[in-house]
Structure formats: structure tokens, C-alpha cells
């Protein structure tokens, strides 16, 4: 489900049910609220819930991010995200497993259909309640191939 509350405010809800032979059945719910600030900038609130046969109760994550799209001197597009978030579970203990703050940098690479991303973040994790949180750096590298493109979409929609 998707709706525009206003010209610059968009809401999306996605519900998915899946059955995997190894993992069993599970469902996920996603809520996304985007507020456009300018043509190439937005603030996003994102929440996801996951419940399944092999999850620890309801597993959840939530984040607030600022995204800005840009175009380099070479004509290649990119985007930068700054975010903070948390994730946790409801069973066997109701706890926040991780707090995080990070950035994600995305850039069009060698071809128009090839993108790379680098995402450094700092995380404060705990595995069991009442233990001390441990801080840890995390760096994710991604390479993405864009198979289908809608040239009519704005850059704002493409950075989502």
C-alpha cells in the first residue's frame, strides 16, 4: 500500500508472507515514511517487523535517515545517507539488541547500470539483557546491478 499524504510526504506499507523449506514460514511488515526536503533530499523513517517459525519472537528494526542525491562532474549519479537506528527482539527477552549510527555512500560506477556502495557504521550491541553493551565498527561493501530502469522516475524516487 502506498499513499501521498501531501505533495512532499509519502507513506508505504508492505506486508510479505514467505515459506522457505529450511526456515519455515514467516512474515514481514515494513512501514516507510518519506518527507521530501528539496528535489534531491529527503528524511526517511523506516520500521520493519519480522515474525516466523525460527525468529526470536518478533524481530524488529527502526531507523531515521537523511538522504541526499547528487550528480558528479562525470555525469554519474550518487547518494549519501546519514542514519541512526535500533533493532531488537521480543522473545525470549524483550530487548534492544543493537543501537547504530552510520553513513552509506552510493555511486554509479563504470556503467549506468552498475552501482557500488560503502556503509560504515558504529554499533552498540548486546546479546543478553543486563550485560554491558560492546561497541564495534562495521563496514559493508555492496555491488549492485540495475536490471530494469524507469527513465520517467525522478532522482528522488531512484535513491529510495
Segments from the language model and where they lie:
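Outer-membrane beta-barrel architecture
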Residues: 1, 30-34, 63-69, 100-106, ...
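Transmembrane beta-strands of outer-membrane beta-barrel pores
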Residues: 3, 15-23, 35, 47-53, ...
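Outer-envelope beta-barrel architecture signal
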Residues: 3-13, 27, 39-47, 58-60, ...
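Residues that define the transmembrane beta-barrel architecture of outer-membrane proteins
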Residues: 23-29, 56-62, 95-101, 133-139
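Glycine/small-residue-rich hydrophobic helix-like segments
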Residues: 75-109
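Composition- and surface-driven signal marking solvent-exposed, interaction-prone regions
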Residues: 98, 117-119, 132-136, 157-158
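C-terminal structured domain segments
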Residues: 99-128
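Outer-membrane beta-barrel "beta-signal"
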Residues: 134-160
Amino acid at each position: 500500500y502506498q499513499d501521498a499524504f501531501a505533495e512532499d510526504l509519502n507513506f508505504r506499507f508492505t506486508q510479505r508472507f514467505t515459506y522457505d523449506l529450511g526456515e519455515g514460514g514467516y512474515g514481514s511488515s515494513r512501514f516507510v515514511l518519506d518527507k521530501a526536503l528539496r528535489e534531491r533530499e529527503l528524511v526517511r523513517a523506516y520500521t520493519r517487523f519480522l515474525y516466523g517459525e525460527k525468529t526470536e519472537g518478533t524481530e524488529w528494526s527502526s531507523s531515521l535517515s537523511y538522504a541526499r542525491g547528487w550528480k558528479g562532474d562525470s555525469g554519474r549519479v550518487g547518494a549519501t545517507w546519514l542514519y541512526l537506528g535500533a533493532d531488537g527482539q521480543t522473545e525470549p527477552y524483550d530487548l534492544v539488541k543493537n543501537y547504530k549510527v552510520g553513513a552509506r555512500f552510493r555511486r554509479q560506477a563504470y556503467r549506468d547500470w552498475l552501482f557500488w556502495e560503502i556503509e560504515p557504521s558504529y554499533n552498540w550491541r548486546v546479546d543478553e539483557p543486563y550485560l554491558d553493551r560492546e561497541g564495534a565498527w562495521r563496514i559493508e561493501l555492496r555491488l549492485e546491478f540495475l536490471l530494469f530502469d524507469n527513465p520517467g522516475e525522478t532522482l528522488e524516487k531512484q535513491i529510495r
